[in-house]
Amino acid sequence: MLILSLLLSLSSPVHAAFPAPEKSTAPITIVFPAENSVLGPADAAWLIGNVSEPKGLFKINGETITVHPDGAWLAWVPVAPGTFTFSATLSVGTSFYAYQRVVDVLPPQAPLPAKPVAFDNDSLTPRADLELRPGDWLLTRAKVSPGAKPEFRLGRKGAWQPMREVVPALGIYEGAYLLRTEDETTGAPVQFRAQGHGGAAATAPGKVTVTRATPLVGVLRGQNVVMVRTGPGEGDLFPAIGGTRFVVGGRQGNELKLLLSNGQTGWIDGKTVEMLLPGAHPPRAETETVGVRSGERESTVRVGLGDRVPFIVEENEDLTAVTVRLHYTYLHTNWIVYPDNEDFVDEVRLKQETSDIVAMTVKLKPGKHLWGYWAGFEGNALKLELRKPPRLAKKGSPLSGVRVFLDPGHMPSAPGAIGPLGTKEMDINLAIAREAEALLKADGAVPILSRKDEKDEVSLVDRPKLAVEKKADVFVSVHNNFLPGSSNPFRGGPHGYSIFYYHPHSLELARAVYEGYHKRVPLSSEELRFGDYLVLRNPAMPAILTESAYLTYPEQEAMLLEEPFRKKLAAAIVDGLRAYFKDLRDQEKRR
């Protein structure tokens, strides 16, 4: 540790010294899992920690565990359901030390006993109250004793419906019923029954309302962006902006079902929506005059609508056009006005794509490509800002003058992953970002950090906002990785670096930085990846997220604690940025 401390003390003088982890002085330390943790159903679990004497004989539950020279260790230990104790021992000469860590291991899923016939009440769906309409499907699920042949019905007088076994080994069944007009009801239970050995009955916790009433109108509260999803708790469909109005045609618990145009549906957190009184006009927009305005950093397309309606923005494959699909909208545009000095937008086209969806496609001028965009409302008009690539220095470093937003992931209230020696991910991330900051400054770039020191608290939502406020050209979020709790750390590799992107206009930046890692970082590649991370969803600029190494592994934690390795990671990021902007500059020269 003395050598390591000396290395850390020699860090760059332009920054505060890297905060080395405070290694425990106890003979045995278990960093993860924490005392009384609940571990998922498994036959083994991994642990990390450290010992005070690396050359001692270290065991957990009688199995010898390999210890890294700095005292860190990683173990994969068999477990059993229920309260489980990890008993760790360390033998050093004539000295003997012992330490215990108690956890709760959930039992594996198993079928119910055949007798007496019973339902697993925790398996019954719907779990939450539902509001449905005729033509919707009522979907049910139940776990029941083997061979019981369960059925379900809506209400106490509904017809019994069959269920189909989908997981025979566990006795899990699913059922579906297409609701009809005559099923109209309020707060009806979903009941289950099963045959054999005395039979069994049960009722799902969620009640069902089936209504033919006119759908209500909801408006998104505030000015924040809220994600509309494909289903309750499912993937992203599109972001919606405060003031947007929707037709609401159902509910599942706290989630509202949105009836969009052309038969499409979406789901949104009900707490974010204000429901209007019955009789409120449904959302309806008509496209008015379209105006194009040229700016230094972006060109803006503005179209009057008369209402705030949902819209979905889509970039084309080669980033030469953007299409906005406006729901609940009807084409009524007579004029499209282009300024004399417009050098980015070539043409705007509108068409009635379906009966109530207008597609507005903005084509860029030949040789131009999209850098990023931002779409929002100005009153009841849609304002689409199309960002231009930054102007690059014609000579010297291609990074000269480029504004790079470096986002060291996590913060004191959410420190992220932790290593066997107690290394906090937030500290490593900041140290790498500081090294990248120094390299970028030396290359003439303008680095901007979301967190400048170890005490800074910057929320996840505020980080991309801050990048826009600071007029950044690119966004780089710096992270390190941690294994899922159920993974065997000694199988399923490789375990190394990975680079993530979200929007198509971020892909080339991700590729360039990935290549920088491939050339400089002596770890395995986990390849280039799409990642649905909040900080990457902001479409205003190319944005990527780096996962440099795994704090879980003692070898990789030790590497991250060494300044030369952190410099390599920073250099990989900057190499990628430099190559990306050099390619951009070369493309501009060829035009």
Model regions and ranges:
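Active-site-adjacent substrate-binding region
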Residues: 504-529, 539
